[in-house]
């Protein structure tokens, strides 16, 4: 699959080959995985997929998507409270929080640039709201 990077270059992307090993997953992540498995029982659901071409001059690390469903050209992100509110558990300072918000924005930009649908599941929504976003 050809992908346009945030740097304007084109890349070959094989999402299956760029999955990270799932680390400890949050309860929200597990809940989202269960919902996606139920909604798309015959689709391959990839987790922690590297988004090629997402490095920038300001940020040298590559972005990752929580979930990617290739047959549906769909990225699903699970956003805990730390995506909306600063707290000392996740961030050492406010600058770290703002950098995380910038990464979320760059992920949206990457998906839009590549005509990939992005759905965000927010921590303060219930499972029915998540389901409605996907259906």
Language-model segments: what does each one mean?
Residues 1-135:
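Nucleic-acid endo/exonuclease domains
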